[in-house]
Amino acid sequence: MIIRHLSENIINQIAAGEVIERPANVIKELVENAIDAQATRIEISIVNGGKNFIRVSDNGCGIPADQLTLAVSRHCTSKIVDDVSNICFLGFRGEALPSIGSVAKLKLTSRTQDADNANEISVIAGKIEGPKPAAANPGTIVEVRDLFFVTPARLKFMKTDRAETSAITDMIKRIAIAFPHIRFSLSSTDRMLMEFPATENNTQGQLQRITQIMGKEFAPNSIALNAERESVRLTGFTCLPSFNRSNSLHQFAYVNGRPVRDKLLWGAIRGAYADAIARDRHAVSIIFIDLPPADVDVNVHPTKADVRFRDPGLIRGLIIGAIHEALHQAGVRHTSTHSESVLTAFQIHPLENLKSAQRPFSYTSQPYHRVSTTTSMLQKPLDDSIDLREGIVPMMECLSAPSSDTRATIQTSPTEELHYPLGAAKAQIHKNYIISQTQDSLIIVDQHAAHERLVYEALKNALYSKPLSSQLLLIPEIVELSEEDAACLLTHKDSLQKFGLGIEPFGPGAILVRETPAMLGEINAQALIKDLADEAAEYDTTNNLKAMLDYVAATMACHSSVRSGRLLRPEEMNALLRQIEETPHSSTCNHGRPTYIELKLADIERLFGRK
């Protein structure tokens, strides 16, 4: 075999295979060029999902006539000279236009702001024609026809028109979020698919653009991010834990204005929500990272979708810290979508067979019992109300079954304070849900989910302050596991001991439990060990020690919290409400489920046709 130089056209086709995978990639490259040209209006038109026709026009600075040939030549660019480490533009390689022209029919028409007329140049299968005079407004128009007509085999890998159009809209949305001051529009065969008017280039304008794209639910459930560490600045918005999604498509990350899909950034977001969202759910977050260009390498992927940071630990720590602080500042807030879904679930149906139905038990003839709030529990914050030296057991014993004369309905005095965020307890229904009233709303609390969060936060506070005390089991328990699971769990033996959980090997595939945390009282050691073993493999590295410890705390909290089906006295319900108000991240349990739902009085009145 003879080694020979490849032709320029073949080189461009190879480059196109790396950069241009589908119509969305073509539009991405052209839109980024328009942004680099300081355009404030970008219009995109497509036919058949972009496979037959693409047109991108802008009102940017334009390209002079004598530079049009260079613009469609490989590795010709005005964006860098000799410093690849200091890239300040979205595009920089000079590959996009020649790559597109090698696999499609490309026509570029451009006019500078001070020119009398426009000029156009064409590239068909790598062959350049022109430039020649043309008529056009200041700016640039790029038309691409018959994508991949030179390489028909590539067309076999194209998806349906609808799928390609969906990929294009998703790509434009990602870019539009980062540039709210630019007007974007997308049309297909004379039909407008989406249009985003320009807004102010500030935080408020950014939130307005995000709301245009993400929907009206985003703003009331979002929390602003603003943090800085060394030379790195983080801004953007993240959402309440209970406002989550089943996939990560609603996570957007930008580095110096460039949309990226980086595992480090996704991992940092997941780590920040690790104890607030279920593992199969994903937070809704939009983050912008600005740092010196020399501190990030954007030239590590053909499509520039991945980046490499000089100090990844700094970036991860900044993201996790900023989100934790934002969630903490949010305090007792919950997502509005749960309330809306509850309202939607209400259906008005006439009650049938009222005459034949058995009359319900009436509480009117029964004595009412006032709420006797325990001042010490209401006024103390979480760390003080739970004496860790005596454990959580006294707190749990306080939440015991009520006396026989305690009724489900609670009479409150006229002077009872309703200005607490979660109000005053009024009733417990189905032995699991607490009904409370505020000045302008009704709140339903899941007592198990809420108490699970309280116990979890108490465990974490205790863990990071000092090792937890343990209690010896009178009869040690033997838990049978697979040999692999047992070996994996035993590698975390020292970490588990910090929680007061003492385990030892007991033959192949068996774990001997000698000690359990004293603060949890009596727990099901068998179930606890099996749950821990199921997850231990994922955290089987020293780098994830904190994640492992947090997971252990979450699992223990779940196994020791107040269970559904447990009756509570009025004072216990109110004490639980006050604890929720004092506890961080209390709007969700450790698994991401909501701990309470609020129905505004206006919504209730609307249900009954009063508004």
UniProtKB/Swiss-Prot annotation:
InterPro entries: DNA_mismatch_repair_CS (IPR014762), DNA_mismatch_repair_MutL (IPR020667), DNA_mismatch_S5_2-like (IPR013507), HATPase_C_sf (IPR036890), MutL/Mlh/PMS (IPR002099), MutL/Mlh/Pms-like (IPR038973), MutL_C (IPR014790), MutL_C_dimsub (IPR042120). GO terms for molecular function: ATP binding; ATP hydrolysis activity; ATP-dependent DNA damage sensor activity; mismatched DNA binding. The gene is mutL. This is DNA mismatch repair protein MutL. Keywords: DNA damage, DNA repair. This protein is involved in the repair of mismatches in DNA. It is required for dam-dependent methyl-directed DNA mismatch repair. May act as a 'molecular matchmaker', a protein that promotes the formation of a stable complex between two or more DNA-binding proteins in an ATP-dependent manner without itself being part of a final effector complex. Coiled coil: none annotated. It holds the Pfam family DNA_mis_repair. GO terms for cellular component: mismatch repair complex. Belongs to the DNA mismatch repair MutL/HexB family. GO terms for biological process: mismatch repair. Signal peptide: none annotated. It comes from Bartonella bacilliformis (strain ATCC 35685 / KC583 / Herrer 020/F12,63).
